[in-house]
Curated annotation (Swiss-Prot):
Conjugation of reduced glutathione to a wide number of exogenous and endogenous hydrophobic electrophiles. It is an enzyme of class 2 (transferase). Signal peptide: none annotated. This is Microsomal glutathione S-transferase 1. It comes from Sus scrofa. The modification N6-acetyllysine is found at K42, K55, K60. It is a multi-pass membrane protein. It holds the Pfam family MAPEG.
Length: 155
């Protein structure tokens, strides 16, 4: 069994850790962006969140939806749906001994696709921008899963 120092010498794992940190930081940014838009537009989802703006009917007017808040929230949800599988499959893939350049290509394509997807979602850019970014990132994760299943797992 490999110890932590061996793992830290694994260039593919370290590349994965770097790119995983980037997409996780981006996902954390989306939480902050959602909160920013909720606060600046005074749009809340829960009654207790708008209690500082008054009570009763006065507070109820802040319980509403806003297109900008919903757009950021949907982009964040899309991150959750795509980054979590990338983290799990990417970790297993990085530990399976892939070629460094192939692994880095997978990681870079995924990170680039997710960043571009967020830009396309929040700007908003016309389709097929967002769709292409989504399918590129999804395809990268599928490619890693396929390579992992083909080369290292016994089915």
């Amino acid at each position: 069994m490999a110890d932590l120092t061996e793992l830290m010498k694994n260039e593919v794992f370290m590349a994965f850790a770097s790119y995983a940190t980037i997409v996780l930081s981006k996902m954390m940014f989306m939480s902050t962006a959602t909160a920013f838009y909720r606060l600046t537009r005074k749009v809340f989802a829960n009654p207790e969140d708008c209690s500082s703006f008054g009570k009763g009917e006065n507070a109820k007017k802040y319980l509403r939806t806003d297109e900008r808040v919903e757009r950021v929230r949907r982009a964040h949800l899309n991150d959750l749906e795509n980054i979590v599988p990338f983290l799990g499959i990417g970790l297993l893939y990085s530990l399976s001994g892939p070629d460094l350049s192939t692994a880095i290509l997978h990681f870079r394509l995924f990170v680039g696709a997710r960043i571009y997807h967020t830009i396309a979602y929040l700007t908003p850019l016309p389709q097929p921008n967002r769709g292409l970014a989504f399918f590129l990132g999804y395809g990268v994760t599928l490619s890693m899963a396929y390579r992992l299943l083909k080369s290292r797992l016994y089915l």
